[in-house]
Amino acid sequence: MAVLSRIMKPYRAFQRLPFELKPLAILIGIAGSTAIFTMGYKIYSDPEIRRSPSWVAQTQQKEETKVKKPQFH
């Protein structure tokens, strides 16, 4: 039950807001979410910031650099 009460806490706080402030709270929430997603996208897409190769490139590089062990018959 503790998890459910944590999840419901922001909703209950929103319910207690006066009716006049609810549109402002919604607008602030949407703007904050948009800012977070935009920054995440910019950080992920900028090659200067994101220098590590992708998972696919790492896997391909490992396959190419594997040293084959000699097989003795």
Swiss-Prot record:
The keyword Zinc does not apply. The chain crosses the membrane at residues 21-43. Its main location: membrane. InterPro entries: B12D. One of its GO terms (biological process) is mitochondrial cytochrome c oxidase assembly. Keywords: Membrane, Transmembrane, Transmembrane helix. It is found in: Membrane. It holds the Pfam family B12D. GO terms for cellular component: membrane; mitochondrion. It is a single-pass membrane protein. Residues 54-73 are annotated as: Disordered. This is Uncharacterized protein PB8E5.10. It comes from Schizosaccharomyces pombe (strain 972 / ATCC 24843).
